[in-house]
Regions:
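Basic, helix-initiating cap at the start of DNA-binding domains
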Residues: 1-29, 33-44, 58-62
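C-terminal peripheral helix-coil segments that are non-catalytic and often amphipathic
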Residues: 1-2, 134-138, 169-232
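Short hydrophobic/aromatic patch on the recognition helix
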Residues: 43-54
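Alpha-helical DNA-contacting segments of helix-turn-helix folds
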Residues: 59-68, 109, 124-128
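Short, Lys/Arg-enriched C-terminal cap helix and immediately downstream tail that follows
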Residues: 62-63, 73, 190
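Hydrophobic alpha-helical connector segments
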Residues: 63, 77-104, 142-146, 179
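Amphipathic alpha-helical segments used for helix-helix packing
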Residues: 98-122, 133-137, 161-169, 199
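Amphipathic alpha-helical packing segments from all-alpha helical-bundle domains
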Residues: 117-143, 149-162, 176-191
Length: 232
C-alpha cells in the first residue's frame, strides 16, 4: 500500500490559499474576530508559516480584502444588452450575491474596524466605488458626465451600500424586493435631478426611450402616478 505524498506549494500558490482561507472565514465572522491561529489551522499549516508568507495580520487581511474588493467591483460589469432597468437589476442581483456570501467581510470592508481600518483598506473601498461609478456611466453611454449626473450616480452607490448593510442586520426585508427597489431608487434620483436641469432631463429621456412599456423604470412611474390623489 502506498501513501500519498503531500505536494509542497509554491510561494504564490500558498499565499493565494491563505487569502482564500481567510475570505472563507470572513464570510462567517468579522475579520476582527478571526485569528491568525484559526487561519493557519484551516490552511493546515503552522502559525509561524503564515508569517513566512505575510509579515503581519494586517497584511494578510488587506490581501484578502483586496481580492474581495476586486470581486465586488467585477459584479458591476454588465453588457449593454436589453433595457437599462433590467441590466441594473442584474447588477443588483450580483451585488447582493456578494453581500449574502460575504456578509461579515462586506460589513468590515465598508465600515472599517481595528483589523481593517488602514489607509490601504480605505483605498480599496474607494476603488470599488469608483469602479461601480464607471460601470454605471458605461451603461448610460456617457463618458463625460455633467456634475448633476455624477451626484446622482455616486449618491445611488452610497445608497446601495447602506441598503446592503442594513439588510445584513436582520434581513427583515426580502432581498428581491430591495434589489428591485434600488433600481427604482436610481430612476427616482435621476428623475428628481431631471426635473430641475435640462441636461439631466435629456439624459433621463434617453434612458426612458430604451425602456419597454412594462420595464422597471416605467413600473416606477406607474406606481407614482397611482399615489397621486385623484381629482374629483
Amino acid at each position: 500500500m502506498t501513501t500519498g505524498v503531500r505536494r509542497r506549494m509554491g510561494v504564490e500558490e500558498r499565499r493565494q490559499q491563505l487569502i482564500g482561507v481567510a475570505l472563507d472565514l470572513f464570510s462567517h465572522r468579522s475579520p476582527d474576530d478571526v485569528s491568525i491561529d484559526e487561519i493557519a489551522a484551516a490552511a493546515g499549516i503552522s502559525r509561524p508559516l503564515v508569517y513566512h508568507y505575510f509579515p503581519g495580520k494586517l497584511s494578510l487581511y488587506e490581501a484578502a480584502l483586496q481580492r474581495a474588493a476586486d470581486d465586488l467591483a467585477g459584479r458591476f460589469v454588465e453588457p449593454r444588452e436589453g433595457p437599462p432597468g433590467a441590466r441594473l437589476l442584474r447588477v443588483m442581483g450580483r451585488f447582493f450575491d456578494f453581500v449574502d456570501g460575504h456578509g461579515p467581510g462586506f460589513s468590515a470592508l465598508m465600515r472599517g474596524g481595528p483589523a481593517v481600518g488602514s489607509s490601504t483598506t480605505n483605498a480599496l473601498v474607494d476603488s470599488v466605488r469608483q469602479a461601480a461609478y464607471v460601470q454605471v456611466l458605461m451603461q448610460l453611454g456617457i463618458t463625460d458626465p455633467p456634475p448633476r449626473l455624477e451626484l446622482v450616480v455616486r449618491s445611488w452607490i452610497s445608497l446601495a451600500e447602506s441598503t446592503a448593510l442594513i439588510w445584513l442586520d436582520g434581513r427583515r426585508i426580502p432581498r428581491a424586493e430591495l434589489e428591485r427597489q434600488l433600481v427604482h431608487d436610481f430612476a427616482a434620483l435621476a428623475a428628481v435631478s431631471a426635473a430641475y436641469d435640462e441636461e439631466m432631463a435629456e439624459i433621463f429621456r434617453a434612458v426612458l426611450a430604451d425602456e419597454p412599456a412594462d420595464g422597471l423604470f416605467a413600473e416606477l412611474i406607474t406606481r407614482l402616478i397611482e399615489l397621486a390623489p385623484q381629482q374629483a
